[in-house]
Amino acid sequence: MVVQIAKALGARVIATAGSDERVAKAKAFGADEGINYKTEDVAARVLKWAPEGVDMLWESRRETDFDWAVGLLAKRGRMVVMAGRDARPVLPVGPLYVKDCSVHGFAMFNYTAAEQHPCADAINRWLAEGKLKANIDRVLPLREMAAAHQLQEENTLRCAGTLAGKIILRP
């Protein structure tokens, strides 16, 4: 949804994914450019499209490579980190502060219902306008709830790479 929300807000989006199929999916959801981080030089490709660096970098990997990420940020660029609760990566303070960059953590569970309300309104409006579409990876019968949970856990905690979207359970 991050790609679609960024597009709805008017951003130019460069998305990375771990397979050509996932790159194609990101582009289908609105990414202007897509990079397979397993087969391509991400930094070279990003800096080709944004020679001064990017204004915003949204990081959802559990183990963030801050050296790499800060190198891609433009002056006063911002980075949002939304994964890796137990991660302890090295933070390159020098390059970060010299460029006036900032890093922000984002965890939805820290926001109150009142804080989430305007975001929910915007998301509902974009859904109604067709600007957002659900990214469904698979649909499973409700009786396979344990398997669905295991699949989600394998991909969230162990980076299995076998899930690229939401799991829907049907009664």
Regions found by a protein language model. Name each.
Residues 31, 52-55, 96, 132, ...:
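Local beta-strand N-terminus motif with an aromatic residue
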Residues 1-40:
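Mid-domain Rossmann-like dinucleotide-binding core that forms the NAD(H)/NADP(H) cofactor-binding site
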Residues 114-171:
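C-terminal hydrophobic helical "lid"/dimerization subdomain
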Residues 41-52:
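Short amphipathic alpha-helix with an adjacent loop that forms part of the alpha/beta core around
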Residues 35, 55-58, 80:
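N-terminal Rossmann-like NAD(P) cofactor-binding module of classical short-chain dehydrogenase/reductase
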Residues 39, 61-62, 83-84, 107:
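Short glycine-/small-residue-rich Rossmann-like dinucleotide-binding loops
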Residues 75-82, 91-134:
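Rossmann-fold dehydrogenase core element
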Residues 71-73:
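Conserved helix-to-beta-strand junction in the class I
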